[in-house]
Amino acid sequence: MFSFIDDIPSFEQIKARVRDDLRKHGWEKRWNDSRLVQKSRELLNDEELKIDPATWIWKRMPSREEVAARRQRDFETVWKYRYRLGGFASGALLALALAGIFSTGNFGGSSDAGNRPSVVYPIE
């Protein structure tokens, strides 16, 4: 009887295939040249960080002036693009309103639903 289990590659074969594909397409070089990997290697090889992590972190904490400057720069960036942000927000609001109107079929939504008729008939 034929078995599909024989066709399943082993873990080592899968690893080798993936490694070959990464090499073939140049992803390994891109990964090794990425900022994330370079920064990780730099931190792993930092002797001061290995000896005293608390002092290492404390030295790199930004001062109040640096935090204030960053906050000011961020605010200026947002202020610079305020018209674009306003346009995006108003467009999103308009899209939500139109979606509500078209999905319910009226402006009220549930007022014309079957369980709550908008026309009230007198009881006889």
Swiss-Prot record:
Leader sequence residues: none
GO cellular component terms listed in the entry, alphabetical order: plasma membrane
Molecular-function GO terms, alphabetical: oxidoreductase activity
Keywords, comma-separated and alphabetical: Cell inner membrane, Cell membrane, Electron transport, Membrane, Oxidoreductase, Respiratory chain, Transmembrane, Transmembrane helix, Transport
Subcellular localization: Cell inner membrane
Topology with respect to the bilayer: Single-pass membrane protein
Primary localisation category: membrane
Record field: transmembrane: 85-102
Its job: Component of the ubiquinol-cytochrome c reductase complex (complex III or cytochrome b-c1 complex), which is a respiratory chain that generates an electrochemical potential coupled to ATP synthesis.
Full protein name: 14 kDa peptide of ubiquinol-cytochrome c2 oxidoreductase complex
Protein source organism: Cereibacter sphaeroides (Rhodobacter sphaeroides)
Lineage, opening ranks: Bacteria, Pseudomonadati, Pseudomonadota, Alphaproteobacteria, Rhodobacterales
